[in-house]
């Protein structure tokens, strides 16, 4: 799984960096030719895209390194750091768009040739949609937080390019302030995406539990297993591609230690079949000690 995960995530990061570089060159020409502030906004966003995608590529490769003596749980948290860094990059570009949009709203400047801007924006829109589709496929296969953050970023680019097309069309008919207004709107959307991305990254760094549906699946597997009378103290988190799962099994006091160990091993394998690549720790408790320790069984 880890090899497949690493291959897909690396390809997604390389594809994003290459696409952002191509779009940057196209947008530099379009902005130089038309003077459109909306295209300037898209150009700045492409610069941010390159920085974010390069950061993603480097961090993802680092996060795929196996655990070592100093990092017993691996390097998966680097993905969350990459997502957090992306949110900062994007927030900076949003601030630039606000300032530029306000300046051109106060002093609108007619564009030289909106038609060229329309053609360039359509090309950028098609390229970005192709990239987002590939990233979405990778996210479905890997659940990579870094690729998901990159995908959200490029999804905002799709919205941006659509807004730019509309702004260029309106400017063509003489409404020159439309360009600046759409730049402000794009900036608001980008800032919202950045804040949401940053929140998710921070939650991961703070070891947020797995989603409720996944935790319920774990509980269902454990509590339905023969020889298990109950369970408690389920603790979960995720670091990169690896889920960390800890749970206490409740077993009859009379169950021999060897048999209790076999049951725990079977439960562990069942969890791993459902969540491959997970790090699972199971502790066995006699039923009689659970009330004394103040634990509440998941079956009660």
Swiss-Prot record:
Pfam families: Cation_efflux (PF01545), ZT_dimer (PF16916)
Chain sites annotated for binding Zn(2+): 45, 49, 153, 157
Key words, A-Z: Cell inner membrane, Cell membrane, Ion transport, Iron, Iron transport, Membrane, Metal-binding, Transmembrane, Transmembrane helix, Transport, Zinc, Zinc transport
Protein's cellular compartments: Cell inner membrane
GO cellular component, one term: plasma membrane
Protein's GO biological process: intracellular zinc ion homeostasis
Topology in the lipid bilayer: Multi-pass membrane protein
GO molecular function per UniProt: cadmium ion transmembrane transporter activity; ferrous iron transmembrane transporter activity; metal ion binding; zinc efflux antiporter activity
Domain of life: Bacteria
Transmembrane segments: 12-32, 39-59, 82-102, 114-134, 156-176, 178-198
Primary location class: membrane
Catalytic activity: Zn(2+)(in) + H(+)(out) = Zn(2+)(out) + H(+)(in); Cd(2+)(in) + H(+)(out) = Cd(2+)(out) + H(+)(in); Fe(2+)(in) + H(+)(out) = Fe(2+)(out) + H(+)(in)
PANTHER family assigned: CATION-EFFLUX PUMP FIEF, MITOCHONDRIAL METAL TRANSPORTER 1-RELATED
SUBUNIT field: Homodimer.
Family, per entry: Belongs to the cation diffusion facilitator (CDF) transporter (TC 2.A.4) family. FieF subfamily.
Function, in words: Divalent metal cation transporter which exports Zn(2+), Cd(2+) and possibly Fe(2+). May be involved in zinc and iron detoxification by efflux.
Protein name: Cation-efflux pump FieF
Gene of this entry: fieF
